[in-house]
Structures are given as structure tokens and as C-alpha cells.
């Protein structure tokens, strides 16, 4: 979902190059250890929106590093504002295209990739734009560690069915699959961090679809 342009967000992003990396050269891998000042494990959210999910993760897990990969400047600014307010030194914001994820991250460099409420691109001619299309899966496989995995959530039943089939065709292994995440066992529900969109959608009684999958050796 595209956010309305906010001039303050653009200004804030431009003032903090130490926290926001904008349109990096896809020909050069990013030195994330230098950006974070440590070599802690990295987890990525692709398309972070307003950032409630990724900022909550960063706040709850100070021993891990997080990257919000977000194309929209306004969204990056909103995430940055929360990062600065909460002092989240373990969160970096990358303004870039998800199609270049394997250019931005070295091979075997991240433990988890989160795909939360991605654009379903329902028209057949737009299939290649879906973040669970086979070309994207191949790129995720490159940057994930051997024991790394993907966590995917959506409210769109069509995208969920497509993603299950796409991942299965790619030879992936499913560790967890749910067609109604918010009505799973209490211990699963308690661990779930909602996105802003997820909270609004689930509050109306609509199901949330979710899966965790990895690339079998």
C-alpha cells in the first residue's frame, strides 16, 4: 500500500544517512557489520510499511540486527522516526528494490526473511512481481544461511495458495502452515507480532494466512 507523501519524512531520511541507506549501488555488496558496528545475526523484512513489526522485533531482540527493506521514502521516514525515538541501534533501513536483495546482501548472510502482507499482484501478467515468485525465491536462497528460513503472512487467500504452490515447486520445506493464524494455539498467537495492516484486518474477523518455510539441503 502506497503511503501519502510526507515532506517531513523525506527531510528526516536525508538527515540520517547513518541509519538509512538510500538506493545503494547493486553492483556492490553492503558491509553490514560496518553499518551495525558488530557481526550479530541479521534478519530482513521485505516491505516494512510503517514499521511496527520490524521495530518491535528490534526492540525485543537487542542481540540481533534487523534490516527494513522498503522502497517508499515516506515509509522509511516513519520507520526511522520510531527507530530514533526508541534508540534502536540494531535496526537499519534500506531504501531499495526487493528484486535486488541478493545484490545488497552477501550469500549466507541472513537468518530470516519476513514477507508480511506483500502486494498480491493478482493479474496473471504480473506474476513475476509477486515476492514469492520463483526468481525471488532463488534470490532469498542465496542470502539465507543454511539453516535460515522465510516467514510469510498475508490476508489474501489467492496469494497464499500461490505462494504455497510456488515454494513447493521450488522444493522448499514447510515448517509451519496456518489458514487462520490468530486462532492457532495460544503459544503461537502470543509470539505473533502484528503489522498495522494485520491488526486492522484481523479485527474485522478476517483470517490471516501464514507459513514458515526453508530451503532443504
Swiss-Prot record:
CDD domains: AdoMet_MTases. S-adenosyl-L-methionine binds at residues 45, 70, 97, 119. Pfam families: Methyltransf_4. Its EC number is 2.1.1.33. It catalyses: guanosine(46) in tRNA + S-adenosyl-L-methionine = N(7)-methylguanosine(46) in tRNA + S-adenosyl-L-homocysteine. One of its GO terms (molecular function) is tRNA (guanine(46)-N7)-methyltransferase activity. The keyword Transferase applies. GO terms for cellular component: tRNA methyltransferase complex. Residues 125-130 are annotated as: Interaction with RNA. Substrate binds at residues 123, 155, 195-198. Catalyzes the formation of N(7)-methylguanine at position 46 (m7G46) in tRNA. Belongs to the class I-like SAM-binding methyltransferase superfamily. TrmB family. This is tRNA (guanine-N(7)-)-methyltransferase. The gene is trmB.
Amino acid at each position: 500500500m502506497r503511503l501519502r507523501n510526507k515532506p517531513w519524512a523525506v527531510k528526516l531520511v536525508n538527515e540520517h544517512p547513518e541509519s538509512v541507506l538510500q538506493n545503494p549501488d547493486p553492483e556492490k555488496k553492503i558491509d553490514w557489520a560496518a553499518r551495525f558496528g558488530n557481526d550479530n545475526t541479521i534478519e530482513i523484512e521485505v516491505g516494512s510499511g510503517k514499521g511496527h513489526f520490524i521495530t518491535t522485533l528490534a526492540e525485543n531482540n537487542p542481540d540481533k540486527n534487523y534490516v527494513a527493506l522498503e522502497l517508499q521514502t515516506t515509509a522509511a521516514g516513519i520507520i526511522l522516526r520510531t527507530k530514533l525515538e526508541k534508540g534502536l541501534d540494531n535496526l537499519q533501513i534500506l531504501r531499495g528494490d526487493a528484486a535486488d536483495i541478493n545484490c545488497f546482501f552477501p550469500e549466507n548472510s541472513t537468518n530470516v526473511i519476513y514477507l508480511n502482507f506483500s502486494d498480491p499482484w493478482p493479474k496473471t501478467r504480473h506474476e513475476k512481481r509477486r515476492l514469492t515468485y520463483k526468481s525471488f525465491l532463488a534470490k532469498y536462497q542465496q542470502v539465507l544461511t543454511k539453516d535460515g528460513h522465510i516467514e510469510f503472512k498475508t490476508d489474501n487467500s489467492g496469494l497464499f495458495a500461490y505462494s504455497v504452490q510456488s515454494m513447493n515447486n521450488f522444493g522448499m520445506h514447510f515448517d509451519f502452515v496456518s489458514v487462520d493464524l490468530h486462532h492457532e494455539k495460544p503459544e503461537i498467537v502470543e509470539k505473533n507480532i502484528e503489522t498495522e495492516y494485520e491488526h486492522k484486518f484481523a479485527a474485522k474477523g478476517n483470517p490471516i494466512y501464514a507459513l514458515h518455510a526453508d530451503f532443504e539441503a
